[in-house]
Amino acid sequence: MRKTVIVAMSGGVDSSVVAYLLKKQGEYNVVGLFMKNWGEQDENGECTATKDFRDVERIAEQLSIPYYTVSFSKEYKERVFSRFLREYANGYTPNPDVLCNREIKFDLLQKKVLELKGDFLATGHYCRGGADGTGLSRGIDPNKDQSYFLCGTPKDALSNVLFPLGGMYKTEVRRIAQEAGLATATKKDSTGICFIGKRPFKSFLEQFVADSPGDIIDFDTQQVVGRHEGAHYYTIGQRRGLNIGGMEKPCYVLSKNMEKNIVYIVRGEDHPLLYRQELLAKELNWFVPLQEPMICSAKVRYRSPDEKCSVYPLEDGTVKVIFDVPVKAVTPGQTVAFYQGDICLGGGVIEVPMIHQL
């Protein structure tokens, strides 16, 4: 008897090709499932759930597969969006995509897969592992690899997941979509955070977190060099949007004192205080047993390079990460993912004291 695979379909080209490839294999009963996590946007928003669902309908019709829709809007706001706002208000820089994968796609969506009597869940993520029992590894396309975003998802939650695109390059996926005549073949990839769309981040955040004007201080001179509308609008290492003139070198956000509502900056992109030799990580998720010390590499943000490091477990359940070479703009609240080669060992949330606290 054929097993049933539920394809998480977003209306984009990646999930469309996943459904196409699985249907073409002839080994599965393929069922599409569209997940709505966010309502329609206002006049400046770009998160177009209705248009995306129409594309899912078109692909399902082309492939002659059944499809369903499920709304997790309420749960998304409670488990992802509310935390996103809370973390920003407290001075952190969270990653909602990592949260969404852990809390929604590979938790609530998995429960829906069981309801539909699915044997597997297939997604368009560019990574490898899952149902093959190997945990999680990078996708072979270095420009599209998404293992970073899944590093916080428990291994058990991936045990029935298929990643058909993990061994493919994006150019190949586009080519397959075009040759198959899929309706989404030329559709642009979605970018950014779904609930923000193309709006400037500050204009979005100020709808939910009130402005709180304060001083911008040069950390080296302790002189006030400007004013800000809220320390929560800034992230460590940020250069743009400071509105500070008259400086010989560009200014970068070094630290934030949320209690005193101060943003500290330094001048020059290579200022030594912008670099950290170590960090702490909490809310850890491991795909392999943690050894002491674990010699590996770490990625402190999605597009950052791997940095060689040693990971030491601490008694309180966190880990200390010591880098071989100091790393720039280590940001509290961001996700850190650990690797050995292409294998993702796990991940956690960065917890590092601000410079002014040291």
Swiss-Prot record:
Keyword annotations for this protein, in alphabetical order, are: ATP-binding, Cytoplasm, Disulfide bond, Nucleotide-binding, RNA-binding, Transferase, tRNA processing, tRNA-binding
- Presence of keyword RNA-binding: yes
Q: Which CDD domains match?
A: MnmA_TRMU-like
Question: Which parts of the sequence are marked as the site Interaction with tRNA?
Answer: 125, 334
The role this protein plays is: Catalyzes the 2-thiolation of uridine at the wobble position (U34) of tRNA, leading to the formation of s(2)U34.
Q: Name one GO cellular component term.
A: cytoplasm
Of which family is this protein a member?
A: Belongs to the MnmA/TRMU family.
Q: What is this protein called?
A: tRNA-specific 2-thiouridylase MnmA
Principal place where this protein is found?
cytoplasm
Against InterPro entries, the record matches this protein to: MnmA-like (IPR004506), MnmA-like_C (IPR046885), MnmA-like_central (IPR046884), MnmA-like_central_sf (IPR023382), Rossmann-like_a/b/a_fold (IPR014729)
Q: Which residues bind ATP?
A: 8-15, 35, 124
